[in-house]
Structures are given as structure tokens and as C-alpha cells.
Amino acid sequence: SFVIARMPINKAKYLTDYTYNYEYNLVFGGESYPMGENVYSIPNSWIVDAVNLSVESEFKWIVTAPSLDKGWTYCGKVDSDATRYGKSVRRKTLSTTSNGKKILKDTNNSTLDFTPEVKPSLMN
């Protein structure tokens, strides 16, 4: 998932106060492997917008709160398929104002709001 957030604090405070460590055991083939990492969190209240992404054939679950995004979209249909590169998702346009400003669709559901597998706009 990707988010756009407004950070109401400075960088130093964020890096100090919003870090956490997670740990779990990856169990595979009868073996258990301890896993973990130090990461940073972004409170949902700071998030302006979110999009959940997956390769279509590999989608498992939505990792954001439903208030942020109730759906998901994709840039490739099959993992490890070289044709999935050079693609993007693009938010759908509802309308365009008289001065040319696009009004974008935003229902907090990426399945409905984005067109998958489009050519990135900077490549046009």
C-alpha cells in the first residue's frame, strides 16, 4: 500500500516517537524462522489518501483500515511476468472544470477509483 500523509510534527520527533519493532515466527516446511524489524508507523489520522496494490494473481488481503481504502488495484496480472513493468494505476476522472482542472474519483475504494495497468503519465 501507498499513502499520502500530512505530518504534523518535525522529522526528528517523528523518527523518535513513531518507531516500533515487530517480531514473528515464519513457519515453513516444519521449520520455524524468527523474523522481525524496526519500522515506522503513520497514524491513520495523518493519512490523506491511500491505495492498496498487489499483483492481481497474488492478492491476499487489504492492509489498510476500511476508512482509508476498502478496495485494491493492480499493475500486473501475474507475479514474475516481465510485462508487468512499465505500468501504473491511474485515478479515474469524474469531470473536468471549465479551466481544465480534473475532478478525480475518490470513494476510498481503489477497486472503483483506479484504472489498472495503464501507461504511466510521465511516459506519455
Residue ranges and their predicted role:
Residues S1-N124:
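Intrinsically disordered, low-complexity linkers and terminal tails enriched in Ser/Thr/Pro/Gly
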